[in-house]
Regions:
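Bacterial Sec-dependent N-terminal signal peptides
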Residues: 1-24
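Phosphate-group recognition and catalysis centered on beta-loop-alpha active-site segments
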Residues: 22-148
Length: 148
């Protein structure tokens, strides 16, 4: 094989590798929560996403007034604003499937067990910039500390 042929083969292999990486992936938004026994952003929805063999599961996080990060899409639980409540005030809140509101710590620990599932974390915005900035720092530190 001459240098010209080697160059063509190498270029084709590189293009093939790039096309594999650029393929569309399926993400379970808030986990696979329409399944029986599941609820949005629940640990069950995370496990069900893995069982469905999707590429990843997106989930939303909010931080309480005392700095505990919880997994929840809305900025309220019932009529309680998560960012104004302490974790103690909301920790027993039930999701539609009966699970209690998961913390980010619990969610990441569960996600770590699901080796083929990518976790896509969305930090929900907060009207209070200082609270939002602290949430970002807390979340990034937790993810790094867990080696994820």
């Amino acid at each position: 094989m001459n240098i010209y042929q080697k160059t063509i083969v190498t270029a084709c292999l590189c293009l093939a590798a790039l096309s594999i990486q650029a393929q569309t992936q399926v993400i379970a938004h808030r986990g696979y929560w329409k399944a029986e026994g599941s609820a949005q952003n629940s640990l069950a929805s995370l496990r069900k996403a893995a069982e469905a063999k999707v590429y990843g599961a997106e989930f939303d996080v909010q931080m309480t007034a005392d700095g505990i990060v919880v997994v929840n899409h809305d900025n309220t639980i019932g009529s309680t604003a998560i960012s104004r409540a302490t974790y103690e005030q909301i920790k027993d809140s039930k999701l539609k499937n009966g699970e209690t509101l998961p913390t980010l710590q619990a969610y990441l620990e569960e996600g770590r067990k699901l080796k083929d599932l990518q976790l896509i974390l969305e930090i929900k915005k907060n009207k209070n910039k200082e609270h939002e900035d602290q949430a970002v720092k807390t979340i990034v530190k937790m993810v790094k500390d867990m080696g994820m």
